[in-house]
A protein has these predicted regions:
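Flexible "arm" and connector segments at domain edges
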Residues: 1-63, 67-109
């Protein structure tokens, strides 16, 4: 599914299910979801182990929750995320051309 399709799907769902939250509520919710993703990363890859009482969370689901909120926020502000992502990739591709080495170029050095 393309980002534009995701945005349309979410917009249709939101309109049937109560409308968009306020901008600050959306930002607070995004912060909450990023925190949940960070917590799971810390449990898996960091020094903080889960308590025995804590269940297993899915990185995929936590990332999808963050994406959901970003798409909602983009819709609320009439932002075409596909177009914005295209501009960001063009910027990064130009700015960082030759900046990083790959394992293949490191081995040949």
């Amino acid at each position: 599914m393309q980002l534009s399709d995701m945005q349309r799907t979410i917009d249709a769902w939101i309109k049937v299910n109560g409308g968009y939250w306020s901008e600050l509520s959306m930002l607070a919710r995004l912060t909450e979801e990023v925190g949940e993703l960070a917590r799971e990363y810390n449990h898996r890859f960091g020094d903080k182990r889960k308590k025995a009482s804590e269940g297993e969370a899915s990185l995929e689901d936590e990332m999808a929750d963050v994406l959901w909120l970003l798409l909602c926020m983009a819709n609320q502000q009439d932002i075409d995320l596909e177009a914005a992502f295209g501009r960001t990739m063009a910027k990064i591709t130009t700015r960082d051309a030759g900046r990083f080495t790959t394992p293949e170029t490191d081995a040949g050095a």
